[in-house]
A protein has these predicted regions:
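Glycosyltransferase specificity loop/lid
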Residues: 1-180, 185-195
Length: 195
């Protein structure tokens, strides 16, 4: 598969779920698409974008033609840049508050399109970012949900309801298992606590 001719270059907006284990696979996919001739806009939350710039340096995201980073707010109040965000709060906030900033970003990208930046032609978003489906419908562009965790994780997610209905989860006696694991860990790595 070769590169896409310049005249019909598609512009994909890639939106990962704002956790490292979701950002990295999406970034790899975005780089592959860019290598094949796509114009890529990679969307991070403001919080994660600041952390990325701080860890890699202010110019670390420069230098790739047709590959740009944009940000949207996650809807959470500002927090310490060195502290991980509360995942349940982040999940609720991004699903409730993500649609408007995303639509504003797509409008901005489309209104400022030029010969060097084509209008947005598609969205690839994390499977956990389903609000992007509404944005894609509003702009009349396709949206692909990309599942970033492992296939085993995907199967667990897809069949979780059935596992609960059959009584297979939550696992019976899981508290006892966790306590045993903690005791073994302490015995091996911190035996002084057992004295």
């Amino acid at each position: 598969m070769g590169s896409i001719p310049e005249a019909i270059k598609p512009h994909v907006v890639c939106i990962p779920y704002p956790l490292q284990g979701h950002i990295n696979p999406m970034l790899k996919l975005a780089k592959l698409l860019h290598h094949k001739g796509f114009y890529v806009t990679f969307v991070n939350t403001e919080y994660n974008h600041k952390r990325l710039l701080r860890s890699r340096g202010p110019n670390s995201l420069d230098g790739l033609p047709d590959f740009h980073f944009e940000t949207i707010p996650d809807g959470l109040p500002p927090s310490d840049a060195d502290v991980s965000q509360d995942i349940p709060s982040l999940s609720v906030s991004i699903s409730k508050n993500g649609i408007l900033p995303l639509c504003n970003l797509i409008s901005k990208l489309n209104n400022t399109s030029s010969w060097d930046r084509p209008p947005v032609t598609s969205i690839i978003s994390d499977g956990c970012m389903s609000f992007t489906l509404d944005a894609a419908e509003k702009f009349g562009i396709p949206n692909v949900l990309f599942w970033t965790p492992s296939s085993c994780g995907f199967l667990g997610y897809m069949h979780y309801r059935h596992l609960v209905e059959r009584g297979l989860t939550p696992l019976k006696g899981i508290i006892i298992i966790i306590i045993i694991i903690i005791i073994i860990y302490i015995y091996i790595y911190c035996p002084c606590y057992l004295l």
